[in-house]
Amino acid sequence: IVPTVVGDHIEYSIGHDPQGAPSAGTIAGGKGRCLACESLVENKYIRRQATSKGLGQQLIAIVAEGDRRREYLEPTQVQSDVVVGIERPADVPTQAVPARNHDVDRLPMYGMPTWGDAFTARQLVALTTFSDLVGEARERALRDALSTGMAEGERLEEAGAGATAYADAVATYLALGVSRLTDYNSSICSWSSSRETVRNVFSRQAIPMTWDFLESNPFSKSTGNFLGQIDWVSQSVKGSSTSFAGFVEQSDATVAKYVDVVVSTDPPYYDNIGYSDLSDFFYVWLRRSLKGIHPRLLSTVLVPKEEELVANPYRHGGRDGARCFFEDGFERVFARARRNANPDYPMTVYYAFKQAETTADGRTSTGWATILGAMIRSGWTITATWPMRSERGGRMTSVGTNALASSIVLVLRPRPEDAPIIDRRGLMR
């Protein structure tokens, strides 16, 4: 895409000569560069403008499905007018984005204080429509089930197994499809040059600011379409075992019952991911579609956060407070599991090790040391470790970042009460 300054505005054209391609981007080193006058503008000024007056949008190119390849087209004035002329729906998510969490703070920083602001008007029209249709689909599924003679029964949330629960299940799966659709239909989506397709929001485990974003067509056959998301959900259902009944219980891990169970856990990685704040991106849409079907599960306006076992400095009064909260909670979880542990069955713990988690002098990070220390103090013995290459090296998360490189499976068994103690010097001997 080649920008050209024309009078007081900038026009964009599709170039085919690599020699004429722009040599660099316009945002780097905390500054933005004006294409017209080459002036540098501080990021803090751009953010002030974004929060006070908002950022504009301009359609600069259209990607079409061609004969076994992508076609890149310059938008007409009519097409550009359609984009800016769409009216934003009234009933959109208005829940606030946490402004102090670095995983999501780019949104309010650039004039998007609510979760609904992360989407264009056209995307909001599509998502609210799909979301509302979930309820209509449930009513149709209920009528169809009742017409076959199936008993009405209890709701799905009450462990029902009749027509009502069936309709609730259909609606739940459809809502999960809509939830997946948001990942490919927001103003945070970017363009993958290598695959020539839209890149989803969570290609990284954080929400960045995207200056040149993509709007995918939910009715197309390309990446990000709605039926593709439904297919992912259906494949997951097909892959689930139907030989045994599964039971899921959501509870605080520090007080959960670990009796007659085998524990295998993938715990939070200290401060690496702000799970609950990031989950709000999907939760606001799931709640819109399913709060009448799962009222207890979706009773809160946003994802509950206070008990989340993550070392979050802004939620626990700084780094020291976050470390103490995580260390204390982690130790209580493992002590609770140790209380009724069966020595015949080991506990397995997955830990994703960062590429730069070990420094040049061999010291490990706070997260790794905290987790190991909590396990040992809780009465466990680490009897084996198995490395697993669980992350794809070329994925977006790993390119130029301190990404999670591999997983280590720790095998734990209860340490006998009369186990002897040895110091480091004795161990080295």
Put a short name on every predicted segment.
Residues 1-262, 268, 272-319, 333, ...:
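Nucleic-acid modification enzymes, centered on SAM-dependent nucleic-acid methyltransferases
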Residues 320-328:
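Nucleic-acid endo/exonuclease domains
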